[in-house]
A protein has these predicted regions:
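Active-site beta->alpha loop and helix N-cap motifs at the rims of alpha/beta catalytic domains
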Residues: 2-136
Length: 136
């Protein structure tokens, strides 16, 4: 797997919502364009800042696709891929289209408080399943 260099200013994007709680794609496009045009060196999509856990699987996939298409290769993208269930995360890693992304970002399962060995096993499984470099 090729290493990537993450230098400079990375911005974790928020996910804007409409009044009906659907994703506001017009506002999301504005956020992306603002960050790219103002010098962000890379963007982090669907991390904890973006409220990714409140989105359905199809919404997460659509946001990831939309941002990748909007950025169109102008700067690197990192896709947030986290879950409290390692097994479910493995399935999501297999099903996700990573087109346009340079790496994934994964956080420690936060609800069930795994042991140090559990954290190690979780991230070992993530690293083995991910087709991209993993940022912890």
């Amino acid at each position: 797997m090729e290493r990537i260099s993450l230098r400079g200013m990375g911005v974790a994007l928020a996910t804007p919502f409409n009044d009906d709680f659907s994703v506001d794609y017009e506002a999301l496009k504005g956020l992306v364009e603002y960050q790219v045009s103002n010098g962000a060196d890379y963007l982090v999509v669907l991390a904890t800042t973006s409220e990714a856990v409140t989105l359905s699987c199809s919404e997460r996939d659509e946001v990831a696709r939309f941002v990748a298409e909007t950025v169109a290769g102008r700067i690197p993208l990192i896709l947030g891929m986290s879950d409290n269930c390692t097994h479910r995360l493995m399935s999501h890693l297999k099903e996700t289209d990573f087109t346009g992304y340079s790496a994934i970002l994964s956080v420690v399962p936060y609800y069930n408080k795994p042991s140090q060995e559990g954290i190690y096993r979780h991230f070992k499984a993530v690293a083995e399943a991910s087709p991209l470099p993993v940022v912890l």
